């Protein structure tokens, strides 16, 4: 089963950064839940952990909500990962394998080291990326993917067509 805590928390953090840039001071857990395609209780659990680790702050109650606790440029993706994953291993070997040969006997130790190395490399990568830089990259992807769609739509409806009209 795929663990979606990190991508969901990252989407929440990116949404809060975007909201801040658009002049929306706070978002409710219900609003964020709609955006991430989840239920508010799941979002609140993630927000509680992010708040505990100083990544978001909020106001409780009917008119409350959450926002980033620091500027988006000062929050790394590694901080978000560590906050919501809470130190659990990235992967783990099966424990129910009978020890019959060199592979099955040492698989657990080998896989633990492999997992540790992979997670260290991933955290190095995530440490070099911030919420702000990630939002910038998303904007760039949006521009790249939206431009061809806009051009195709304008051709379909005849915008920018300098040739004779068929109407």
Across the structure, where does each feature detected by a protein language model lie?
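Conserved segment of winged-helix/HTH DNA-binding domains
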Residues: 72-97, 115-117
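Basic amphipathic alpha-helical segments that dock to polyanions
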Residues: 46-53
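Short alpha-helical segments that sit at the start of domains
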Residues: 1-13
